[in-house]
C-alpha cells in the first residue's frame, strides 16, 4: 500500500489554504455564538458574492456584470431564507442578461430575491455549525478524498477557525 503524506492548513478567516492539485482528506472547524458555515471551493480566484431567488426549480442569480456565458460551469453556495435554500453544487449556467444567469436546482421551492449566494469555478463541500457550537467539529472524507484541481479556498462565515487536511 502506497503512503501519501498529508498536510494541513489553518485559517481564521476566508482565504486560500493551498494552490494546485490536491485531495481534500478532512475538515475541522470551531464555531462561534452564531450559527456558521464553511464553504469549500476549488479555485484560483476568490469566490464572488451575488444574490439569488428561486421559483420552483429555477434559481436566478444576480451579479452586476458577471461576465459569464451560457454553458459555463460554476460552483455555487446559497444562503438560507425562510427555512429554505438553493442546493449547493456545480451547475451549468444559462445567461439571461449582463447581470443575471439561471441554474436548475435539483430541489424546488420559493425563495425571495436578494438572498445571498457565492460562486466560483467549482464547489467541493459545505459544512454548518449551530449557534453556540464552540467545540471542534471534524469531518473525515471517505475514500481518497475530494479532488481539487486548482486550489482550495475556504469561505468562512461565523467561524472561529477552520483546518483542512489534504495531500
Language-model segments: residues:
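Small/polar beta-strand repeat architecture
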Residues: 46-123
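Surface-exposed, low-hydrophobicity beta-strand/loop segments enriched in small/polar/acidic residues
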Residues: 1-47, 53, 75, 94-98, ...
Amino acid at each position: 500500500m502506497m503512503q501519501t503524506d498529508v498536510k494541513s492548513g489553518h485559517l481564521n478567516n476566508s482565504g486560500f489554504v493551498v494552490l494546485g492539485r490536491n485531495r481534500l482528506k478532512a475538515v475541522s472547524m470551531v464555531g462561534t455564538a452564531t450559527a456558521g458555515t464553511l464553504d469549500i471551493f476549488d479555485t484560483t480566484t476568490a469566490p464572488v458574492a451575488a444574490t439569488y431567488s428561486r421559483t420552483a426549480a429555477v434559481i436566478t442569480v444576480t451579479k452586476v456584470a458577471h461576465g459569464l456565458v451560457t454553458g459555463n460551469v460554476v460552483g455555487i453556495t446559497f444562503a438560507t431564507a425562510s427555512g429554505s435554500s438553493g442546493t449547493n453544487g456545480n451547475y451549468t449556467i444559462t445567461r439571461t442578461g449582463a447581470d443575471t444567469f439561471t441554474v436548475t436546482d435539483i430541489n424546488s421551492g420559493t425563495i425571495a430575491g436578494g438572498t445571498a449566494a457565492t460562486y466560483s469555478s467549482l464547489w467541493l463541500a459545505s459544512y454548518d455549525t449551530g449557534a453556540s457550537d464552540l467545540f471542534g467539529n471534524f469531518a473525515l472524507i471517505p475514500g481518497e478524498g475530494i479532488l481539487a484541481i486548482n486550489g482550495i479556498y475556504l469561505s468562512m462565515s461565523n467561524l472561529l477557525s477552520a483546518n483542512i487536511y489534504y495531500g
